[in-house]
Each structure stands twice: as structure tokens, then as C-alpha cells.
């Protein structure tokens, strides 16, 4: 009649905080959150059920209840905030924290969650009860709260030296231990080996203070939960085992936990010594006992699956005996599951790191093989230093002699000094100077000016392309429009610089009669010459005597004899095109050239034929 009304949330809250759970079951926790959000009075009933669970004497039930309350505060809004900040719930927290039988981990978890809820409810003054309860708990239990994080200070040289000394001492002890084990194994005294190894293992822990340097500490256990406040810090919970990597700051080390790497404060952890030989033997013995019960577990399972429903289990002694024998190994089995689960995670992380390192190495190796040193294969070809042969220009066929020397086609640029071609190269006029009397350049007449008989000045024919032979000097070369001459350089001028130093000094030159008649006829008809007159100012005097041979000497008839002996030539000697070596010098009479400006006098053959 006076029995309290059953709470609808007792079952689902008890399911989410069951003592048999190995960890928080978030599926059950979220089911409670969904039901509270859908019910108007769900937050009040759920908090009442959690107060009952806090009175449970099992520490796991109390810890799971704190996680459920924290999930309600984050997912159910102001309705859950109001019930969590109520006097009934805060009083239940204070009673549990002040109880001397409460586990220290439960007390620290109470203080941690009350701090979070105080910050969460600070914007609403109606929820000030939680803040007052938190301040009261801190004043009554100052040792519950986790220590403050130390400042990050750089490691001094003295600290580095101390770390190195501890490392050397640990290495020396390890070497001593190995030597002791080897000597005892040779003596055959197994009992003495166990005693010596145990003492050797205990020596480093006695000689090295706990938590001094990272050189001698491989693992630490978390004493408190740590929430990172800056990038690079490692998050962990109380009880986690952290692998130590190195020391970074004065009171901060770098460690690895569940695949994450970061720094953590030393006052939040405690050093874990490496297991001794005795501890390893106890672990191996415990594993052997667990695996020895496998047959009994399988036998018990077979009996229970084949028994009839009418069978009374309590009366069956075999089933009862098997059940109690297998029940004793359950705590050991859970411990081994946790141990090998941790090892499995460590091996998985190690494998992932190895795979990543191998991929990075292969990528770098492939990149170094596919990108060799810079080569010059793809560079464009450099242009030649000589001008192309005149035969490549349209309208000027080139009669190159076979097997010419490369020097014959080289023509320096105007800014370069010309190179003299060999005087006796086959294919040049005057290759045999002993058969032709060549006058020196000082005795060569200048027929470009008007003669005494009124003959007009010979126009200067300039090549349409740079000369090929060595006749060209450093003067600027002009390029007039294309003409119909095969070898226009032969008619450029009549003055040549003879390369023969022993030629006669007083030979007189004049035009051939046919040439003179042609010039007079051109002057009478008023035809305009197609070649520009020579200007001494345009071309500087040659710097070296030219190897260009002059025209063949004929008996002077008309006009009157004229001789010129200038002190030095004031013009550029014109080069002549090459002629096939099979063609010799012309031995007949001199024939005049007819300019192409008049149609009736247009040449019908190569102009070079007049000189052969």
C-alpha cells in the first residue's frame, strides 16, 4: 500500500550501468538519452534512477553512472541541466565523495565532472547549486583534484648531462646482467641464475629515480585523466599505459598511446618498471592454467547442450564441478584478453608505421630514379657560325666543287676578322700564278670612274648573300634585290689585290674593245645602270691583301692607256663565286658583258663564261 511507485527508467539505467560491462556501452547510453528527450518528465525520472545507482557499492557502476549523467548533459538540453544541478543530485555526489570507502578513482571522476558541469551551467544563474557544491568539494578534499600542468621549460645542459649519465649506467647494468647470465648458464646452476637475474633487474629501479629522465623509462601509467589544451599534447585517461619516446621539455615527455603521439606532463603519470624474470614466469604460468581449462570448458558446454530440460543441474555433480573449475579462470581470462588486445593494437600500429615508412622509401627511390640529372638532349641545335652557301638561295645555283674544305664555306660576321683562304686551293682563278702575269694591287687601274674617252663608271654589283670565300673583309655587306646572274660577284669591280708578291710592277690595264663599245652604247641610249656606284666612304680599306685573282691581261687597244698607282686601295675587294675545278682559265679573247637592263642585250648564258 505504501510501496513507492516504480520508475520507468530504472531498467534502462541499470542496463546502461551494469556492473558486468567491461566498458561504457554507448548504445545503451544513447537509448536513455533518446527516451529522456522524448519524454517531458524523462530528465527528472532518469536522474532519480541515477541517484539510486550511485548508492551501489561497485565502483564500475558508479563510474558508468557518471558517464551516463555526462551524456545527458550534452544531449538533452536545459531540462537535463536543471535536474543535474538540483540539490538532490549534488548532495548525492558530495556524500559519495566524502565516503572513505569510495574508490579514489571515483572521487577524482566526481570532481572532474562537477568542474565540467560548473563551466557548462555558468551562463544560467538558476544552476548555481552545482558551482557551490563544486567549491565545497574542493575545499573539503584538496587531494582529489588533479595537479596543475607544469610550465613548458627548455631542458638545460645539466639535465641533458644527467640523462646521459643515467643512460650509460643502465647500459652498464644491462651488460653486467648479460655477462652474469652467461657465466651462470655455463656453470649449470639454474637456481643461482634466477636469483642473480632478479637482483640485476631490481638494480636499475633502485639506482634510477622514478620519472627523472626518459632515457631509462620505457612505460608510464596515467594517474589522472588529461585533456589537452594546446596542439601537440597527448590525451589519455587514468590507467592508460603510455610508451615513452623522449624528453621534450623540463617536465614534459613525448609518448605514444593508441596510435597517437604527443607530449604529456610528468605529474600526471607514474613510472612502470620493466617486468622482472619472476613476473614473466608468473604470467606464463597463469596463461598455462587458463589454456589447461579449455577442455573442461568444452566438456561443460557439450553436457549443457545435450542435457534434457528436465535435468536438475544442481543434482549433477559433474556439471557442478566443471562449472566451478572453469569459473575460477574467468578473471585471469579477462586479464589475458586485455593484455593481448593491447599487444595486438601495438603490433597493428607498428605494422602501419612500417607500411608507411616503406611506401615513403619506395616513393623517394622511384622519384630519384625517374628524375636523373638534367641532360642537354632536348636543347635546340645551335645555329652555325658561318653563313649558308649561296646555292641555297633561290635564283642563284651553286656550283660547289666536290670535296671542298670546310674553310671555304666559312664567312665571318662583320664584327669578326676574316680568315684568309689558301691561295692555291683548287677551283680558284689563278691557282697556278706562274702562268698568268698578275699586277700588284698598286698598279691595278680603277675603271669605276669615267675614262678619258667619256666611258661611264662601272657600277658596283653587290652580292645578294654574304660571300663564301675568303675575299670578304670586315666591311659591311649590302644585299640588293635578287638578280638573274649566276655569279654576280665577278662583275663587282675590276680592281683586285693580287696575292703574288713577285708579279710585274708596271703592267697597264684597259678595257677590252668589245667592253668599251658596250659601255659607249649604254651611255648613248641613256640606260640607267642597275648597280649603285662605289663609294669609298662606305667601305674601309682592306686590312690584308686579298687572294682574289684579277681578270686576264689583254693587249691595250682602246681607250688610251691609263695607269694608276694609288698609295693604298680604298675599297672592298669583291669576292667571286666558286667554279668547278675541272674548268680551267679561258684562253681566248676578252668578251664584254651585256647588262640585263636592255632586252636586246640580255645574256643568253652564264656571265662567268665570258672570263673562261
Curated annotation (Swiss-Prot):
Show the ranges annotated as biased composition (Pro residues).
538-559, 566-578
The VHS domain covers 16-145
Q: Which domain of life is it from?
A: Eukaryota
Q: How does it sit in the membrane?
A: Peripheral membrane protein
In what residue span(s) does the SH3 domain sit? 215-274
Give TM segment ranges.
none
SUPFAM superfamilies xrefs: ENTH/VHS domain, SH3-domain
- The segment annotated Disordered runs over 176-212, 372-612
Cellular compartments annotated: Endosome membrane
Query: Where are the compositionally biased (Polar residues) regions?
Result: 182-199, 413-423, 491-508, 597-612
Keywords for the protein's UniProt record, in alphabetical order: Endosome, Membrane, Protein transport, SH3 domain, Transport
List GO molecular-function terms, semicolon-separated.
Answer: phosphatidylinositol binding; ubiquitin binding
Q: What does this protein do?
A: Component of the ESCRT-0 complex which is the sorting receptor for ubiquitinated cargo proteins at the multivesicular body (MVB).
Question: What family is this protein classified in?
Answer: Belongs to the STAM family.
> What is this protein identified as?
Class E vacuolar protein-sorting machinery protein HSE1
Q: Which organism is it from?
A: Coccidioides immitis (strain RS) (Valley fever fungus)
Amino acid at each position: 500500500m505504501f510501496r513507492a511507485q516504480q520508475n520507468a527508467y530504472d531498467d534502462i539505467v541499470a542496463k546502461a550501468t551494469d556492473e558486468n560491462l567491461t566498458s561504457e556501452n554507448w548504445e545503451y547510453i544513447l537509448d536513455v538519452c533518446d527516451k529522456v528527450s522524448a519524454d517531458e518528465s524523462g530528465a527528472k525520472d532518469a536522474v532519480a534512477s541515477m541517484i539510486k545507482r550511485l548508492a551501489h557499492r561497485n565502483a564500475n557502476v558508479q563510474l558508468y553512472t557518471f558517464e551516463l549523467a555526462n551524456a545527458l548533459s550534452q544531449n538533452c538540453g536545459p531540462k537535463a541541466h536543471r535536474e543535474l544541478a538540483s540539490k538532490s543530485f549534488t548532495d548525492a555526489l558530495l556524500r559519495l565523495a566524502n565516503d572513505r570507502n569510495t574508490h579514489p578513482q571515483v572521487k577524482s571522476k566526481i570532481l572532474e565532472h562537477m568542474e565540467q558541469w560548473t563551466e557548462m551551467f555558468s551562463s544560467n544563474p538558476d544552476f548555481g547549486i552545482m558551482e557551490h557544491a563544486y567549491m565545497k568539494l574542493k575545499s573539503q578534499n584538496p587531494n582529489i583534484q588533479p595537479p596543475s600542468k607544469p610550465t613548458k621549460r627548455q631542458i638545460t645542459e645539466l639535465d641533458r648531462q644527467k640523462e646521459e649519465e643515467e643512460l650509460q649506467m643502465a647500459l652498464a647494468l644491462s651488460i653486467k646482467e648479460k655477462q652474469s647470465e652467461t657465466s651462470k648458464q655455463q656453470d649449470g646452476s639454474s637456481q643461482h641464475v634466477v636469483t642473480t637475474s632478479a637482483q640485476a633487474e631490481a638494480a636499475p629501479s633502485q639506482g634510477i629515480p622514478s620519472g627523472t629522465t626518459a632515457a631509462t623509462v620505457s612505460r608510464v601509467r596515467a594517474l589522472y585523466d588529461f585533456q589537452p589544451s594546446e596542439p601537440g599534447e597527448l590525451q589519455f585517461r587514468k590507467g592508460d599505459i603510455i610508451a615513452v619516446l623522449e624528453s621534450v621539455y623540463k617536465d614534459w615527455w613525448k609518448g605514444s598511446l593508441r596510435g597517437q603521439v604527443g607530449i604529456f606532463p610528468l605529474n600526471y603519470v607514474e613510472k612502470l618498471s620493466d617486468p622482472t624474470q619472476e613476473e614473466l614466469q608468473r604470467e606464463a604460468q597463469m596463461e598455462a592454467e587458463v589454456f589447461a581449462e579449455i577442455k573442461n570448458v568444452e566438456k561443460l558446454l557439450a553436457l549443457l547442450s545435450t542435457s534434457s530440460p528436465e535435468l536438475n543441474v544442481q543434482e549433477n555433480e559433474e556439471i557442478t564441478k566443471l562449472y566451478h573449475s572453469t569459473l575460477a579462470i574467468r578473471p585471469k581470462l579477462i586479464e589475458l584478453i586485455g593484455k593481448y588486445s593491447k599487444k595486438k593494437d601495438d603490433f597493428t600500429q607498428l605494422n602501419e608505421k612500417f607500411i608507411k615508412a616503406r611506401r615513403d622509401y619506395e616513393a623517394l627511390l622511384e622519384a630519384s630514379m625517374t628524375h636523373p640529372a638534367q641532360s642537354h638532349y632536348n636543347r635546340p641545335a645551335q645555329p652555325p657560325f658561318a653563313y649558308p652557301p649561296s646555292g641555297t638561295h633561290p635564283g642563284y645555283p651553286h656550283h660547289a666543287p666536290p670535296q671542298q674544305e670546310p674553310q671555304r664555306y666559312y664567312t665571318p660576321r662583320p664584327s669578326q676578322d676574316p680568315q684568309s683562304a689558301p691561295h692555291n686551293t683548287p677551283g680558284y682563278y689563278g691557282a697556278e700564278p706562274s702562268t698568268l702575269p698578275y699586277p700588284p694591287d698598286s698598279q691595278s687601274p680603277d675603271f669605276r670612274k669615267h675614262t678619258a674617252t667619256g666611258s661611264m663608271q662601272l657600277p658596283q654589283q653587290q652580292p645578294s648573300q654574304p660571300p663564301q670565300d675568303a675575299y670578304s673583309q670586315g666591311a659591311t655587306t649590302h644585299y640588293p634585290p635578287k638578280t638573274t646572274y649566276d655569279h654576280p660577284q665577278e662583275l663587282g669591280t675590276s680592281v683586285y689585290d693580287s696575292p703574288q708578291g713577285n708579279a710585274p710592277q708596271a703592267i697597264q690595264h684597259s678595257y677590252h674593245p668589245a667592253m668599251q663599245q658596250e659601255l659607249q652604247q649604254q651611255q648613248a641610249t641613256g640606260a640607267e645602270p642597275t648597280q649603285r656606284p662605289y663609294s669609298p666612304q662606305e667601305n674601309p680599306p682592306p686590312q690584308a691583301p686579298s687572294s682574289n685573282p684579277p681578270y686576264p691581261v689583254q693587249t691595250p687597244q682602246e681607250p688610251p692607256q691609263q695607269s694608276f698607282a694609288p698609295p693604298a686601295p680604298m675599297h672592298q675587294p669583291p669576292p667571286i663565286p666558286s667554279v668547278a675545278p675541272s674548268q680551267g682559265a679561258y684562253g681566248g679573247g676578252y668578251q664584254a658583258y651585256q647588262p640585263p637592263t636592255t632586252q636586246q642585250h640580255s645574256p643568253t648564258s652564264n656571265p662567268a663564261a665570258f672570263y673562261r
